[in-house]
Amino acid sequence: MSKLTKNQKLALGKIEAGKAYTLKEASALVKEITTTKFDASVDVDVRLGVDPRKANQMVRGVVSLPHGTGKQVRVLALCTPDKEAEATAAGADYVGLDEYINKIKGGWTDIDVIITMPSIMGKIGALGRVLGPRGLMPNPKSGTVTNEIGNAVKEVKQGKIDFKVDKSGIVHTSVGKVSFTPEQIRDNAKEFISTLIKLKPTAAKGAYIKSIYLSSTMSAGIKIDPKSVEEN
């Protein structure tokens, strides 16, 4: 394990051991403890009281972050020719069909999100081996299989993200950048956590939100008091 730098030690010292911070406090503190020279991502990790191996306890959904993610999201719109102008106008980085299907078959995955139409899913099913492991397979539940191509592209570009619980019962997502104001970080994190709470499966027993941590790339995690999420 590499030694901590002087700045990292100072940053770590700002987190009080064992303390659960309010979301408001944590959103300001995460900026103070970040020592990277680049604009680091701000991440939220929520441990849920669910058993993801059971279909009736799977948690997945979408959320539109009020201040976006701060990331440049590369969008591929796989659509019929009559929808190409709509997708391009909405801001899709790549627009087409057979040309891009062939590129993906050849291993090309230099994109973050694929948006497509129900009528085309038959062609895209064959790409599952390439897209599935990378989390790129379009899904009606996340709004990436739709006839409203333009709207879907705009939403993704503006900060709509999809998430799902992993096999350990944790949901992890990025809610912005360190360059965001504490208020923007808090608003985004609050929207994400509130959405998670609404998605609680009826089959889940006991405490649903077990823990919440806020961190930035390479920073320590800041424990958050779940009760503080809805506070103003």
UniProtKB/Swiss-Prot annotation:
Q: Which InterPro entries match?
A: Ribosom_uL1_bac-type, Ribosomal_uL1, Ribosomal_uL1-like, Ribosomal_uL1/biogenesis, Ribosomal_uL1_3-a/b-sand, Ribosomal_uL1_CS
Q: Which Pfam families match?
A: Ribosomal_L1
UniProt keywords (A-Z) are: Repressor, Ribonucleoprotein, Ribosomal protein, RNA-binding, rRNA-binding, Translation regulation, tRNA-binding
- Keyword Phosphoprotein listed? The answer is no
Q: Which SUPFAM superfamilies match?
A: Ribosomal protein L1 (SSF56808)
Gene Ontology annotations for the cellular component aspect, listed alphabetically: large ribosomal subunit
Give the similarity note.
Answer: Belongs to the universal ribosomal protein uL1 family.
What is this protein for, i.e. what is its function?
Binds directly to 23S rRNA. The L1 stalk is quite mobile in the ribosome, and is involved in E site tRNA release.
Name it. Large ribosomal subunit protein uL1
Q: Which organism does this record belong to? A: Parabacteroides distasonis (strain ATCC 8503 / DSM 20701 / CIP 104284 / JCM 5825 / NCTC 11152)
Which gene name does the record give?
Answer: rplA
